[in-house]
């Protein structure tokens, strides 16, 4: 999977962009604030329908413009697609695939599996459980065809139940939802547990390469007592849930936990080690997708050199090259990319929102 061409209009400070990319490595060189992270953000938005920088659409659309537009040409093996996304200031999103309307963001996400590595991405490890649930759910979205529908229905039922709890409804009014909610909760949790277990040896093996000085242990917690019947828990805890106005236990509390030397990694590891572990997780997940589904991720790496010494940068560069994935990397200077000794690459300079190819 690779983006061969990208057009960007009215997105942040970027001047109208029309770029052809290398299917392997693409380097974006420029000072802070030049627009190189904005280009990564545009690529990410094309594959997710949202930004990794801001939840406020009006901050992303160029000043005094009604919308921004993204268009990409995608190649995978012998197949090619054109994808387009337009976001209006009023909030509406228009999605086209091969020129046809009526597509959803989830259709774009399926076409464009992406892994994002940024300085802010450490929330995967030191943030709340929701970041790690999202990590697992991303994998299941691409591995398990029935997951997205089940996950969407599960979230819908949880919202309905929480609304009923907030309205102080009796259990007789909620019981009918609990039957289906429990069924979906067990299914989603089983998928998460199986995916976490499949990923665990790949994570631990990659950790031995990047963090040989540490023993990293990985575990999945489903969000309620192991081996307990979730339907019974919903019944038993109804009064507590009603007092809280929300459902306390369940798959919405699941977590994918990482420990080093028996302690949570955020309490033990340095920022540099946390960044390496984040890279390990993204690499392992991308490589697992390739192994199981024969699909490559697109890797977006912002500020490649930060927090990593020369040896670790060389290790990461080598592993990315071995993955066969398309990679986009930002850096302030070309010197920061000297460990990226790759043959197939394109170099771009970014200055005040203007992007030019250097080779």
From Swiss-Prot:
Keyword Nucleotide-binding: yes
One Gene Ontology molecular-function label: ATP binding
Keyword Aminoacyl-tRNA synthetase appears in the UniProt entry: no
CC terms in the record's Gene Ontology section: cytoplasm
GO terms for biological process, alphabetical: DNA replication; DNA synthesis involved in DNA repair; double-strand break repair; SOS response
Chief place of localization: cytoplasm
Any single Pfam family the record assigns to this protein: SMC_N
Keywords: ATP-binding, Cytoplasm, DNA damage, DNA repair, DNA replication, DNA-binding, Nucleotide-binding, SOS response
Binding positions (ATP): 30-37
Top-rank taxon: Bacteria
Compartment list: Cytoplasm
InterPro entries registered for this protein in UniProt: DNA-binding_RecF (IPR001238), DNA-binding_RecF_CS (IPR018078), P-loop_NTPase (IPR027417), RecF/RecN/SMC_N (IPR003395), RecF_2 (IPR042174)
SUPFAM superfamilies, A to Z: P-loop containing nucleoside triphosphate hydrolases
Listed NCBIfam families: recf
HAMAP family: RecF (MF_00365)
Function: The RecF protein is involved in DNA metabolism; it is required for DNA replication and normal SOS inducibility. RecF binds preferentially to single-stranded, linear DNA. It also seems to bind ATP.
Family affiliation: Belongs to the RecF family.
Name of the molecule in the record: DNA replication and repair protein RecF
Species whose genome carries this gene: Haemophilus influenzae (strain 86-028NP)
